[in-house]
Amino acid sequence: MLDTEPDLSTRLFSHIDFTHGAVAAVSGGSDSTALLLLLKHHFDRTGSSAKLLAVTIDHGLRQGSAAEAQAVAKLCAERGIAHRTLTWTGRKPSTGLPAAARDARYHLLAEAARAEGIGLIVTGHTADDQAETVLMRHARDRELADLAGRGLAGMAPATLYDWREWIVRPLLGTRRSALRDFLRREHVGWAEDPTNIDEAFERPRVRAALAGESAGHMENTLRLAGQAAVERGQLGASAANLIRRIASQPSTGLIRLDPALLIADDQAAIYALRILLATAGGAAFLPDQARSAALFVRLKAGFLCATLSRTVVDFRHAGLFLRREARGLPPAATAVDNTIWDGRRHITLNDMSGALLIAPLGAAAARRLAIDDGETPASLIRAALAAEPTLLQAFENLGLPQGEPRLPVFAARPVVSPFARFLPSFDLAPARAVAELIGASPLPASPLGGHSAD
């Protein structure tokens, strides 16, 4: 059911934990302005002492953006709300501008949140935005309807950014027209961004087409998204259960899958395999559904060695093993603290006294490691360790206990690659299962009631 008259009722914010404050992303448009005022009303009504910080991102892409940011600052000053304006600086891409602007926006919002010790970012995405997103994804790939709703689920009510800050969208059930009615009752205006009607971009084209449809079309699209979200969550839960049953990590960088995977439900098994392939290979996106399904069929036929998503798939008597392929590993480069290496490892430097070079361990160094023979072939362990990061100047003094590259001057913690940047709440279950498997950092608790990572 769509919310058509937003107010201070509990339906909008009562399920969100604001204990540690919130950063509200406010552009000055109607949706984000209404969100800000609704949040302010909620904080005042509940007597919350937590900080509400409005942040406006000036992308610097058109005239008038600075004036709009100033208008937001003025409104915040009038309403007693803390406000900051952050600017997207540097060169802008000639293609893919909307995506680049989105990435820059979330990066700046996260920086602002971290500076205040706030782990929650709230955005004003509406039911209209959700319908547009679903239609855009459907138009891009007609096969999405057969993929248990992964894309057709649209935007998640919450998304974990960089495995640290939660981005929450409390207005996904609220129409833009209702928000504007609310602002009129408050006697508050808003800015109109001309790019929102510039049909040179995909979203404005979809928005224009949707405006010509009946209200029933909007309702049906959102109903589709809701059903797809349920199916995506169910598939993720099945995949998570499967990962916990059949996956293990005999050595750093090496995942073993029990052949029981091949007799499990095909849909859950293929989804679990895709997530693990992307994680082992350090890929930001899951491998292609069709190619993954074809690989699954080949695995059912017997032993093989193949590559997909930068991952070597080695099926032999000892089990089904996944590891990063040697091709395309990062070249030696200066180590930078708090960065992601090869899409797979979060690098933390414990010694900042001088420049350090980080590089893959390499096959030659891996061959010198003393590895006890066990259930897992030593050759597989060495191949996996060869793709792990180490310091160039430390090759002769690795001192690696149990064959694992651990140096006191730096730490390399695994990350769940396909979910490391954006983790939709739909996918919490498989993300947590993989994090437990590979030893990634635990997931921070979701601020939404009823959204568990279990």
From Swiss-Prot:
GO CC annotation: cytoplasm
Respond yes or no to whether keyword RNA-binding is given for this record.
no
Q: Which reaction does it catalyse?
A: cytidine(34) in tRNA(Ile2) + L-lysine + ATP = lysidine(34) in tRNA(Ile2) + AMP + diphosphate + H(+)
Give me the residues that bind ATP, please: 27-32
Give the transmembrane region(s).
none
Q: Which SUPFAM superfamilies match?
A: Adenine nucleotide alpha hydrolases-like (SSF52402)
Report the EC number(s), separated by commas if there are several: 6.3.4.19
State what protein this is by name: tRNA(Ile)-lysidine synthase
